[in-house]
C-alpha cells in the first residue's frame, strides 16, 4: 500500500507520498472479521451456560461464575496487550489475540473427553484473554482508519459484523450443542441409573467438541490472512511513544479526563447488563413459560440477536444523522424501561420485552467506547485498554444477578440489576450531551 501512517492528532489514514486519504478496504474487512469472531465466542457462552448447568448440576449463581472465569481473562489482558502494541504494533496485538483464541478453544476437546470442568474454565479464560487482545487492538484501529469525524460510524459499522456473529453463534450453538442432546427434566433424570446419568451428562459435554474445533480452524485461517496482509502504521507507533512516557504517567493524565472516567463506568455497566440479560434469557423462558424447553427457548435467544442486529443497523443510521451521545441516551432509557417490564410483568410479556431490549443494547458498546477514547491523543492505547478491561462487568454482574434470582426464587426479579446498569449509561450519555457543546 505504500508508505502510510495514521496521524495521532487527526486519526486519519494518509499516503505520505500523495498526501491524500487512502482506502484500506482489505485491512478494514479483516478487522470486521475479528468483530464477527469475538461475537461467536462471547455468545456461545450463553449456550454453554444452560448446557453446563445440567451437565455439572449448577445453581444459577454457580452457572454465572462461568461468565466470571471468561471475563476475568478479558480483565487482566488489555494492559499487557496495550504495552505489547506500544512496543510493537496493533497488528502484533491482533495476531497474539488470535493465537490465544485458538489455543483456548482447542482445550475444549480434551476437557470434554475427560469431562473436566476446571479445564473448560481454563479454556474459556484463555479464549477471553485472546479476545481482550483483539478488542484492545481492533476497536481503536477501526476508529482511526479514516477521518476522526466518522470514527463513530466506522466503529458501529464494524460492530454490525459483531451482531451478525452473535446470531450465527446462537444458531450454531443451538443446532450443534443444545439440540444435539436434548435436555431432560428432573423427573426423567431421577429415574436414570447412575451409569445412565453419567453417560447422559458426558454426552452433553461431548457435544461442544465439534463446534469449538471448527472455531479453531477458522481463527487460525484468519490469523494467517492477517499475517500476510500489510496494515497501515499509526503515527503514534512511530513518533509519539517517546513523548507518551511511562504507564503511570499515562494513567495520571487519563484520570484527569472526566469523559474517559465516565466511559469506563458506563462500559462496565453495559457489558454487565448485556451479559446478564443474555445469560439468563433461556432460564427466564423455561421458568416463566409453561412447557418451555431449553432447546426451544434458544429460539428467543436467536431473536435477541436478530433484534441486536437490526438495532445496530438502525442505530448506525441514526448516529450518522444525530449526535452519538443523544442516540445513546435514548437507547439506554428504552433498554432500562424494557428491563423493568421484564422484571414486573413476567410471562410472555416479560420475555418479549427482554428479547426486544437487545435492539436497544446494540449501539451502546461502540458508542460508549468511541466517546470514551475521543481526544485522548497519545494516551489512546492505554485509554482503550482500560475501557476494554471493563468487560469484567460481565463476570461480576452476571453472578450477582444469579445470586439475586436464587434469593428471590425467580429470574424476573433479578432483571432489576440490568435496569440499574442502563440507568447509569443514561446518566453517562446525558453527561456527554451537556459537555459536547462546551
UniProtKB/Swiss-Prot annotation:
PROSITE patterns: MFS. Residues 54-61, 114-117, 179-193, 288-293, 344-347, 408-410 are periplasmic. Optimum pH is 5.5 for fucose transport. Residues 2-26, 88-90, 145-150, 228-257, 320-324, 373-379, 431-438 are cytoplasmic. This is L-fucose-proton symporter. It holds the Pfam family MFS_1. It is a multi-pass membrane protein. Mediates the uptake of L-fucose across the boundary membrane with the concomitant transport of protons into the cell (symport system). Can also transport L-galactose and D-arabinose, but at reduced rates compared with L-fucose. Is not able to transport L-rhamnose and L-arabinose. Binds D-arabinose with the highest affinity, followed by L-fucose, and then by L-galactose. Keywords: Carbohydrate metabolism, Cell inner membrane, Cell membrane, Fucose metabolism, Membrane, Sugar transport, Symport, Transmembrane, Transmembrane helix, Transport.
Amino acid at each position: 500500500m505504500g508508505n502510510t501512517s495514521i496521524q495521532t492528532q487527526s486519526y486519519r489514514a494518509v499516503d505520505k507520498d500523495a498526501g491524500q486519504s487512502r482506502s484500506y478496504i482489505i485491512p478494514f474487512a479483516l478487522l470486521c472479521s475479528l468483530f464477527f469472531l469475538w461475537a461467536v465466542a462471547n455468545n456461545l457462552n450463553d449456550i454453554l451456560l444452560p448446557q453446563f448447568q445440567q451437565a455439572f448440576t449448577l445453581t444459577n449463581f454457580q452457572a454465572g461464575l462461568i461468565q466470571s472465569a471468561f471475563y476475568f481473562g478479558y480483565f487482566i489482558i488489555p494492559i499487557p496487550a496495550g504495552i505489547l502494541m506500544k512496543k510493537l504494533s496493533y497488528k502484533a496485538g491482533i495476531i497474539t489475540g488470535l493465537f490465544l483464541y485458538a489455543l483456548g478453544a482447542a482445550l475444549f476437546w480434551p476437557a470434554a473427553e475427560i469431562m473436566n470442568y476446571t479445564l473448560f474454565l481454563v479454556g474459556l479464560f484463555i479464549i477471553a484473554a485472546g479476545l481482550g487482545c483483539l478488542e484492545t487492538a481492533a476497536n481503536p484501529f477501526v476508529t482511526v482508519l479514516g477521518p476522526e469525524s466518522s470514527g463513530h460510524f466506522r466503529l458501529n459499522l464494524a460492530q454490525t459484523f459483531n451482531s451478525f456473529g452473535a446470531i450465527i453463534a446462537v444458531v450454531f450453538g443451538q443446532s450443534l450443542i443444545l439440540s444435539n442432546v436434548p435436555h431432560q427434566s428432573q423427573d426423567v433424570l431421577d429415574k436414570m441409573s447412575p451409569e445412565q446419568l453419567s453417560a447422559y451428562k458426558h454426552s452433553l459435554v461431548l457435544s461442544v467438541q465439534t463446534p469449538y474445533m471448527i472455531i479453531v480452524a477458522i481463527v487460525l485461517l484468519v490469523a494467517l490472512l492477517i499475517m500476510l496482509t500489510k496494515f497501515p502504521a499509526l503515527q503514534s507507533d512511530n513518533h509519539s511513544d517517546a513523548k507518551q512516557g511511562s504507564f503511570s504517567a499515562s494513567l495520571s493524565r487519563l484520570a484527569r479526563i472526566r469523559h474517559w472516567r465516565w466511559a469506563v463506568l458506563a462500559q462496565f455497566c453495559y457489558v454487565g447488563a448485556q451479559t446478564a440479560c443474555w445469560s439468563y434469557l433461556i432460564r427466564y423462558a423455561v421458568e416463566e413459560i409453561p412447557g418451555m424447553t431449553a432447546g426451544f427457548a434458544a429460539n428467543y435467544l436467536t431473536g435477541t440477536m436478530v433484534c441486536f442486529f437490526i438495532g445496530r443497523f438502525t442505530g448506525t443510521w441514526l448516529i450518522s444523522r444525530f449526535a452519538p451521545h443523544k442516540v445513546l441516551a435514548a437507547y439506554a432509557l428504552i433498554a432500562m424501561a424494557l428491563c423493568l417490564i421484564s422484571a414486573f410483568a413476567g410471562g410472555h410479556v416479560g420475555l418479549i420485552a427482554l428479547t426486544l431490549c437487545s435492539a436497544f443494547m446494540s449501539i451502546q458498546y461502540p458508542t460508549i467506547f468511541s466517546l470514551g477514547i475521543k481526544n485522548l491523543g497519545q494516551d489512546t492505547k492505554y485509554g482503550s485498554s482500560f475501557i476494554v478491561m471493563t468487560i469484567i462487568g460481565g463476570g461480576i454482574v452476571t453472578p450477582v444477578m444469579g445470586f439475586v434470582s436464587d434469593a428471590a426464587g425467580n429470574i424476573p426479579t433479578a432483571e432489576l440489576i440490568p435496569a440499574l446498569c442502563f440507568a447509569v449509561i443514561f446518566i453517562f450519555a446525558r453527561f456527554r450531551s451537556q459537555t459536547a457543546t462546551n
